Amino acid sequence: MTYKECKYLIKSDLNRLTKVKWRGGGIKYLFFNASFRITFWFRIGSYLARQKGILFKLLYGIVFLIHKHNQYLTGIQLPIGTQIGEGLCFAHFSCIVINSTALIGKNCTIYHGVTIGGVRGPKGGAPIIGDNVVISSGAKIIGKVRIGNNVMIGSGAIVVKDIPDNAVVVGNPGKVISYNGKDHIQYFVN
């Protein structure tokens, strides 16, 4: 990841929360908005972890500690280096666990109590989540499953099978109840 890419990801995460520019209020969000604070330090840490040189390693150590502290404050386990696209938004926080090997597309909205977890063993793996996905409170996405684009996962749903594009999923186990997810997520993504 280049510095320019890191900066773009940070700005797109901020734009999911507000339309203020970085200099016009982004710093305020860094101090007072838990969602932006956790994603900011996650992006900076992910950038520094891929850099070479003693100065970058020293800075990474400091950022790692800041990020770890923010994980404790927010209750969001977001490992540095996890591959997550632009526009990540935690609408509410606490009790959120994201596997470090999960792949998450752009404009993902995650509510409290969500688990995006992997499974060990020969059939193991972690979820691959598409673009413009809303994961409602208490939902669990477990194992090597693919979640399509424009998907809405309802509160408390437990997803252990692949979900196609534009689906709305509810229940335990998660079942597709409609294919108008694109209509539902427009209120969360824009």
Question: What is the meaning of each model-derived region?
Answer:
Residues 1-74, 184-190:
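Terminal amphipathic alpha-helical/low-complexity segments used for targeting or macromolecular assembly
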Residues 74, 80, 85-86, 91-100, ...:
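Left-handed beta-helix
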Residues 180-182:
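Flexible, disordered linker segments and immediate boundary regions flanking tandem C2H2 zinc-finger modules
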